[in-house]
């Protein structure tokens, strides 16, 4: 069976330049590659034809022989053993077209970026609300100041890896394919350090603690994270440094609780003020302010003091302070006080005075109805 013309296989003219041939090969190789057509024998045979045509037409000597003698140039005795499969380097094609399949292409492995670091910072509520600048000390890896990150002894330079010749990749042939792998000798860096730095022992980085001044913006809360770009560990062999993340944890406050941008606090008042009303001082983060308590105030009533909360870290309106009233039962009464309270209770008409204690009346009426229903 006559073999198909190489130019026809690739779909190019006989005057096509090498770049046109490469372009045609990339397109066809992608289409008929066995990994994309598993089990398809026709596609596999087509791929072999495409590869054979490419190898001949991109070799100037083989192409000239083919143009003059056709396929006869590569038959036994035709060209002094030149034959197909003479070991052409397809790394330029495979590196571009099949980089993902064969280990990521031809390029040298990039030096690793430095690791990110985390620092847990505890703040008081006042610091979180107002903002604060704090100094912290963190252990990290910094660029070696002797070799400046190269890992080589001063006055020397890292040498090109003799295994991969500086590419960071080695080529392993498997059948028709040249498989690219990370060089095991230099771990993909493309260079070797023959004379390592005495301080960092060739690593390019040294362990060190550093002090940083961290500005905490006003309004942060537990769980917020502040990023300091480039303040993490130094990268390997000149690669970028990682980042430092400051994780905020706000301590519990003895008076205030925070929910979002609002603050809450409990304000105890005696039962006389709860009944008669009056004025008390309540704490805020800016100092004491007066709060008017109306008569007949019950435990649990909330009083809102606008703008006395927390300003959002993202800007916008300021939160409020909500004061929850707790009516205290008097303790440590003397005989006179007990007598006065007894007289007061009698003036109410007893423990369940209907007029002065509407909630008590409602409660006891409900209890009475419950037992009445049980006895019916």
Curated annotation (Swiss-Prot):
Names of required cofactors: Zn(2+)
UniProt keyword annotations, A-Z: Chaperone, Cytoplasm, DNA replication, Metal-binding, Repeat, Stress response, Zinc, Zinc-finger
Residue ranges of every copy of the J domain listed in the record: 5-70
Sites where the protein binds Zn(2+) 2: 161, 164, 183, 186
CXXCXGXG motif repeat residue numbers: 144-151, 161-168, 183-190, 197-204
Zinc finger (CR-type): 131-209
Binding-site residues, Zn(2+) 1: 144, 147, 197, 200
Subcellular location: Cytoplasm
Family matches, as Pfam families: DnaJ, DnaJ_C, DnaJ_CXXCXGXG
GO molecular function: ATP binding; heat shock protein binding; unfolded protein binding; zinc ion binding
Cofactor details (free text): Binds 2 Zn(2+) ions per monomer.
Zinc-finger among keywords: yes
GO aspect biological process, one term: chaperone cofactor-dependent protein refolding
Quaternary data: Homodimer.
UniProt function note: Participates actively in the response to hyperosmotic and heat shock by preventing the aggregation of stress-denatured proteins and by disaggregating proteins, also in an autonomous, DnaK-independent fashion. Unfolded proteins bind initially to DnaJ; upon interaction with the DnaJ-bound protein, DnaK hydrolyzes its bound ATP, resulting in the formation of a stable complex. GrpE releases ADP from DnaK; ATP binding to DnaK triggers the release of the substrate protein, thus completing the reaction cycle.
Family annotation (NCBIfam families): DnaJ_bact, PRK10767.1
HAMAP family xrefs: DnaJ (MF_01152)
Name of the protein in its database record: Chaperone protein DnaJ
Organism: Shigella boydii serotype 18 (strain CDC 3083-94 / BS512)
Lineage: Bacteria, Pseudomonadati, Pseudomonadota, Gammaproteobacteria, Enterobacterales
């Amino acid at each position: 069976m006559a073999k198909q013309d190489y130019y026809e296989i690739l779909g190019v003219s006989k005057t096509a330049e090498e770049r046109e041939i490469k372009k045609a090969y990339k397109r066809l190789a992608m289409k008929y590659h066995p990994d994309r057509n598993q089990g398809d024998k026709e596609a596999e045979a087509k791929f072999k034809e495409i590869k054979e045509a490419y190898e001949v037409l991109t070799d100037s000597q083989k192409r000239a022989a083919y143009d003059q003698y056709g396929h006869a140039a590569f038959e036994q005795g035709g060209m002094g053993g030149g034959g197909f499969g003479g070991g052409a380097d397809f790394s330029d094609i495979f590196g571009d077209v099949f980089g993902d399949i064969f280990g990521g292409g031809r390029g040298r492995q990039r030096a690793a970026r430095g690791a990110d670091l985390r620092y847990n910072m505890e703040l008081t509520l006042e610091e979180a609300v107002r903002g604060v600048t704090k100094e912290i000390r963190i252990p990290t890896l910094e660029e070696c100041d002797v070799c400046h990150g190269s890992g080589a002894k001063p006055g020397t330079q890292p040498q090109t890896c003799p295994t991969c010749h500086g590419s960071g990749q080695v080529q392993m042939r498997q059948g028709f394919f040249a498989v690219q792998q990370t060089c095991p000798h230099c771990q993909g860096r493309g260079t070797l350090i023959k004379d390592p730095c005495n301080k960092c022992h060739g690593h390019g980085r040294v362990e060190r603690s550093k002090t940083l001044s961290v500005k905490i913006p006003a309004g942060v809360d537990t769980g917020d994270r502040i990023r300091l770009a480039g303040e993490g560990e130094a990268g390997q062999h000149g690669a970028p440094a990682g980042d430092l993340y400051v994780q905020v944890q706000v301590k519990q406050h003895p008076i205030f609780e925070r929910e979002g941008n609002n603050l809450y606090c409990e304000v105890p008042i005696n039962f006389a003020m709860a009944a008669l009303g009056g004025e008390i001082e309540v704490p805020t983060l800016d100092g004491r302010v007066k709060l008017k308590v109306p008569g007949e105030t019950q435990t649990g009533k909330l009083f809102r003091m606008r703008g006395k909360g927390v300003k959002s870290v993202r800007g916008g309106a300021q939160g409020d302070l909500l004061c929850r009233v707790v009516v205290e039962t008097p303790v440590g009464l003397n005989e006179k006080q007990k007598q006065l309270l007894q007289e007061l209770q009698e003036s109410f008409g007893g423990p369940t005075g209907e007029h002065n204690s509407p909630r008590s009346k409602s409660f006891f009426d409900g209890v009475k109805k419950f037992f009445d229903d049980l006895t019916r």
